[in-house]
């Protein structure tokens, strides 16, 4: 068991090892907040399993709204064409609703050539440990959670993304980017592209980040309340104007500012 409060990344590490060694399994569930990593490893899995140019014949997709056990069985029965494996991606289907018995029969007898991946994107993954299905997933599959990355790993990743643009960013500036824009990689990669296109020098500064990055609401609220204790009311008013320009609802703005002011009061 992972330490209390620490995310269990064992299935994530095992997935990376499987892809490196070429021993991809037959059954996976992908879920979690970090959509960038989920989509990245799904793409790596496709590249590892399916010959280039043959995806049309060996990659099968099924949306949750169209899911039927019969349809899944038909896809499972499709033999590979000029490939060792087929890959089936089922998106946003709640495994623990609907025909659980029929689904359990399929998952319990997957052919070796099939790699079946259930992807949770718009709906949360909530396992029901009491069901036979949960036992099958544990026995025959791998439930991979893509968690938000630790700050150290995220800083290294940000530095690599900037190096790909022939730019450099310091550790403290990378931390500031995370503070301002959040720690989800899809958001950060968009901001990195904007900053890279804007900055003229080879090394980024906080001024480059402030010039073009889109801040998250909480960061702007923190900047505003942080300007009040030293009496920098002009800056506080300027940041308040930025908050209004973000066109968030007044209730949400009050909630964020109230939270920051409570933290300021208790400090």
Which residues are covered by each model-predicted region?
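Conserved beta/loop motifs at nucleotide-recognition and modification sites
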Residues: 1-267
């Amino acid at each position: 068991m992972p330490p209390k409060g620490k995310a269990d990344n064992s299935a994530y590490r095992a997935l990376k090892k499987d892809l490196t060694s070429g021993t991809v399994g037959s059954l996976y569930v992908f879920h979690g907040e970090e959509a960038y990593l989920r989509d990245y490893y799904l793409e790596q899995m496709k590249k590892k399993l399916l010959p280039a140019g043959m995806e049309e014949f060996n990659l099968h997709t099924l949306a949750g709204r169209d899911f039927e056990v019969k349809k899944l069985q038909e896809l499972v029965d499709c033999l590979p064409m000029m490939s060792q494996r087929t890959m089936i991606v089922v998106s946003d289907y709640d495994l623990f609703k609907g025909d659980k018995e029929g689904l359990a029969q399929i998952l319990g007898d997957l052919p070796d050539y099939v790699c079946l991946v259930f992807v949770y994107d718009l709906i949360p993954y909530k396992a029901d440990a009491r069901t036979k299905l949960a036992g099958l997933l544990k026995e025959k599959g791998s439930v991979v959670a893509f968690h938000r990355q630790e700050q150290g790993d995220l800083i290294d990743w940000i530095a690599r993304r900037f190096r790909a643009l022939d730019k450099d960013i310091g550790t403290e500036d990378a931390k500031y980017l995370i503070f301002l824009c959040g720690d989800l990689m899809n958001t950060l990669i968009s901001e990195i592209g904007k900053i890279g296109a804007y900055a003229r020098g080879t090394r980024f500064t906080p001024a480059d980040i402030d010039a073009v990055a889109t801040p998250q609401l909480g960061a702007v609220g923190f900047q505003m309340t942080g300007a009040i204790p030293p009496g920098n009311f002009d800056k506080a008013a300027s940041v308040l104007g930025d908050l209004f320009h973000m066109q968030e609802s007044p209730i949400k703005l009050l909630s964020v500012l109230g939270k920051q002011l409570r933290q300021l009061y208790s400090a």
